[in-house]
């Protein structure tokens, strides 16, 4: 497979991950009525713009977006990882209780005993970061 096709597929995959993450986030808050905590809002701030940015980049085949999406997705992943640690690691749990009106330790979902909303966001950010790295690597 050619370099440009790899870049195209990676960029589209990153956009798809951001689109699914945004739809999932809106589903949980607007349909299921789960109120987001402060850290959830920060994750949304980092995730939602990717739908527009990466969507435009896919249409224009502008692979330079990866230079910006990689660090932004990495920061979002760090926030998600910290939030997940607050939920799952006892030593971090004390920090989550004073997070805001809705405690960051709350687990609206807990599929298979480990898949929570911050974990899903983490997977989305990692997917975007890896795809961005692939785009950069194949320049």
UniProtKB/Swiss-Prot annotation:
Described by its record, this protein's role is as follows: Required for disulfide bond formation in some proteins.
Q: Where in the cell is it found?
A: Cell membrane
Record GO terms (molecular function): protein-disulfide reductase activity
Pfam families recorded: DsbB
Name of the featured protein: Probable disulfide formation protein C 1
Q: How does it sit in the membrane?
A: Multi-pass membrane protein
InterPro entries the record matches: DiS_bond_form_DsbB/BdbC, Disulphide_bond_form_BdbC, DsbB-like_sf
* Record GO biological process: protein folding
**Covalent S-S links between cysteines:** 37-40, 99-104
Residue stretches spanning the membrane: 8-27, 42-61, 68-85, 113-135
The UniProt entry's sequence similarity note says:
Belongs to the DsbB family. BdbC subfamily.
Q: Which UniProt keywords apply?
A: Cell membrane, Chaperone, Disulfide bond, Electron transport, Membrane, Oxidoreductase, Redox-active center, Transmembrane, Transmembrane helix, Transport
Q: May I have one GO cellular component term?
A: plasma membrane
Chief location: membrane
């Amino acid at each position: 497979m050619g370099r440009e096709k790899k870049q195209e597929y990676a960029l589209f995959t990153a956009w798809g991950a951001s689109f699914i993450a945004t739809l999932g986030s809106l589903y949980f808050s607007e349909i299921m009525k789960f109120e987001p905590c402060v850290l959830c809002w920060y994750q949304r701030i980092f995730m939602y713009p990717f739908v527009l940015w990466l969507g435009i980049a896919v249409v224009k085949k502008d692979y330079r977006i990866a230079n910006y999406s990689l660090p932004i997705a990495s920061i979002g992943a760090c926030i998600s990882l910290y939030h997940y640690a607050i939920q799952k690691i006892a030593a971090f749990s004390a920090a989550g209780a004073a997070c805001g009106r809705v405690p960051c330790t709350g687990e609206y979902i807990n599929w298979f005993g480990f898949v929570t909303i911050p974990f899903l966001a983490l997977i989305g950010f990692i997917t975007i970061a890896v795809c961005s790295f692939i785009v950069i690597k194949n320049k």
